[in-house]
Amino acid sequence: MLFRSGVPALTGLPPGRVALVSFTHVRMPGAEDRARIGAWWAPARPADGLGLGVDVERADAAAFADEDGLGGVGFSTAERARVRELPAPERPAARARLWTRKEALVKAAGTGFTGDPAAVDALTVPADVVLVDLTDRLPGGLVGALARRGR
């Protein structure tokens, strides 16, 4: 389960300190970032000296359906090219995964988007960042990423 394995592994919190109270309520000491999609929550708390960011999205969200939506403005030329290499049915989920990476990276940096989201490179991870794809740990139809900055 994401809350019992992924978050403690990256934050250093013991698994018992991350509590899933219900599908809509998570208790985690000092949680400062969280992603919510429907009834699912993914909290994140940075340890001392670390930045932590998490994002979860629906793979079938309208924003990721084609390049005319977020895909046309939120992604770099290289990111759009990478998505175009995939079969058409896989492209919306690929856009959603790229977006969750971007969101996790800017949250871990503590900046949010300060300019053009296309300028945030979701294909190349900075040396001081650990980026984890959470998709396999989420219910079907959801994609997510968690980034930890600092050592």
Feature roles, as predicted:
Residues 1-151:
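Conserved nucleotide-ligand handling architecture
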